[in-house]
Amino acid sequence: MSSSEEVSWITWFCGLRGNEFFCEVDEEYIQDRFNLTGLNEQVPKYRQALDMILDLEPDDIEDNATNTDLVEQAAEMLYGLIHARYILTNRGISQMVEKWRDHDFGVCPRVYCENQPMLPIGLSDVPGEAMVKLYCPRCNDVFVPRSSRHQHTDGSYFGTGFPHMLFFVHPDLRPRRPVTQFVPKLYGFKIHPVAYGGQEGNSGGNTANNVAAAQNNTTPAGQQSGGQFNNYGL
């Protein structure tokens, strides 16, 4: 950041490789102390970290590398926790919607979701418990970010409720559930769920016996099956 005095700390931080999921929190939001309630108890060196985020000169300058590193780590944590609150506001949601539409968070790897854009989500609101995941609003599942540079971002910096708040505010943006579902088949026939039930806890020999029994129970040629499933569930 020292190479350009005109770039704010927030812009610099969000521009770092691996921080592409973050949006830039408005400084006015950060300057409102009500929005920061309780964070001073969660973040070490809170005052110095806040001054760094807002590009303010610290009251007491400790010129040593160790202290600077600690303040930078605290600033990252503080900004992340502020960010989790900010993206639940109308302004924050609008910024994240733009990033979502630009596919900044990637698309769902599930084939039948047809490249549905995903949203970042935390599995915990407590810092240090879980890394950020990606939520697909179409199949309603979560995935590990594809790029390794995003796999070390704390999930609490996005929170557990962000995607759901976005769709409460913009219900028109919620995609429809996939029309097509994958259907497992064997030799062209659909596999009935019952076919897997008898295999649990059986050894290879028992499985072979089950197959033999199933073959003996199949309908002889020339007779009507009456629409019943055989032991394979086909």
UniProtKB/Swiss-Prot annotation:
Pfam families in the cross-refs: CK_II_beta (PF01214)
CC per GO annotation: axon; cilium; cytoplasm; dendrite; neuronal cell body; non-motile cilium; nucleus; perikaryon
PROSITE patterns referenced in this protein's UniProt entry, alphabetically: CK2_BETA
InterPro entries in the record: Casein_kin_II_reg-sub_N, Casein_kinase_II_beta-like, Casein_kinase_II_reg-sub
Any one Gene Ontology molecular-function term assigned to this protein's record: protein kinase regulator activity
GO biological process: response to hermaphrodite contact; vulval location; Wnt signaling pathway
Keywords: Behavior, Cell projection, Cilium, Phosphoprotein, Wnt signaling pathway
Positions where Phosphoserine occurs in the chain: 2
Post-translational modification: Phosphorylated by alpha subunit.
Tissue/organ expression: Expressed in a subset of the adult male sensory neurons: CEM head neurons, ray RnB neurons, and hook HOB tail neurons.
Location in or out of the cell: Cell projection, Axon; Cell projection, Cilium; Cell projection, Dendrite; Perikaryon
Function: Participates in Wnt signaling. Plays a complex role in regulating the basal catalytic activity of the alpha subunit. Modulates two aspects of male mating behavior; response to hermaphrodite contact and vulval location, acting in the same pathway as lov-1 and pkd-2.
Subunit structure: Tetramer of two alpha and two beta subunits. Interacts (via C-terminus) with lov-1 (via PLAT domain).
UniProt similarity note: Belongs to the casein kinase 2 subunit beta family.
Entry protein name: Casein kinase II subunit beta
Native species: Caenorhabditis elegans
Gene name of this polypeptide: kin-10
